[in-house]
Amino acid sequence: MPSFDVVCEANMVEVKNAVEQANKEISTRFDFKGSDARVEHKENELTAFADDDFKLDQVKDVLISKMAKRNVDVRFLDYGKTEKISGDKVKQVITIKKGVTGDLSKKIVRMIKDSKIKVQASIQGDTVRVSGTKRDDLQNVIAMLRKDVSEAPLDFNNFRD
């Protein structure tokens, strides 16, 4: 019975490359001369540092542009609160979303059931497994989800026959 998984996870290699490119651009830009602006990457978390709120926004813009060039969807990023650290400097923690959330997975299962396509959808942790008897039905489900789900970047993997 053919099946596939609906997941929501960023390519961490591309995220790392985008952070390195952003840091390289920040270190060479004239408007960041003499400032301690940078982006740090630790597992599923990015931390943006800058001298003030304006420069922090500039750092985030550089990061977003580099991620877009590396084909990393910016909907993976979840921005935390801006915190003041020593003196006037500020930092912001940006978490990288991983996995399909509970509400989104329920919405996906409901959409699949309401579509009347002859497939079964089940929630398995942070993924949604879709299985059916025909490969064409599964491809129709993928097309429907790509069209209708816009709040999260979905990937489809583990396609089995």
Curated annotation (Swiss-Prot):
Name of this protein: Nucleotide-binding protein RALTA_A2535
Family: Belongs to the YajQ family.
Pfam families on file: DUF520
Domain of life, per lineage: Bacteria
HAMAP family found in the cross-reference section: YajQ
Organism from which the protein derives: Cupriavidus taiwanensis (strain DSM 17343 / BCRC 17206 / CCUG 44338 / CIP 107171 / LMG 19424 / R1)
Gene3D superfamilies (UniProt xref): 3.30.70.860, YajQ-like, domain 2
Molecular function terms, GO-annotated: nucleotide binding
Keyword line: Nucleotide-binding
Cellular component aspect of the GO annotation: cytosol
